[in-house]
């Protein structure tokens, strides 16, 4: 729904309305919205604030549990519907039990088609800030199944704007399916071939739906309303969908991202370790490690390449600030950065973790991500 907004600032004594332009009106997702769309207003509805689908048993509790803390709970999942968390906990118990096949979890607690089409849309539009937030979870009464509902798409189709603003974000492992590797639900889905097949079908179908011809037809339809407000940039954005489709296909050829552990100092040595990466085709993996005094890794003090194991050791350097960068490589030569990144004024430096050495001891950077 389009809204043409005019504002009169009475605090300044103005008698006229200023034109604030054209806006789109977005419906708030709550019980009323569920009912308006033919869904169950009495069902469970959670706004995902920051949740990687880990069990988090110290926080995700039943509402009548004496240790239940609503504020802590809503740091992860904001309760927008029924406050009975029984089936949420049952789902998380199964999802985090790796002896339970993902195929049975998808058949009971999630709708494969829903997950596949949701992820396909995020991948094609480059809406990268959806790994663990910017979505809703909905489950109707008398059903164990949870559905992911799309929410907050303000980060989509941002590649051109980021280039103009010279901001480094939405790159490296945030492109393609590797963006979802840190989330238990999505990781287990992607490790399941039947889901990957459904995802590929959904991506191809949505890609056809987002064709340049269809988008241009829609633009022509809206032109009579929005013509005077159009800028050139949105008209040139279709290429980004095509680029995101290519990135999605290529992301299965690369290793998956992983986390770098906190460095350990002992007996005059500095030990580094990290999680193992994963390759969809089962190719052999190796790791390249660089330790430097700067986040661009130009002032290098230690480096190793083609490491077969996710660890290495070097002599303990003097006090100061240091950065470790780790990349995984498969047998085909495709590389992937670690999940860790270092923030600067121009955005993210991927695959890099900052730490300090003070009096021979490791001190973590408070801004480590």
Predicted regions and their residues:
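Exposed aromatic-hydrophobic patches
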Residues: 309-316
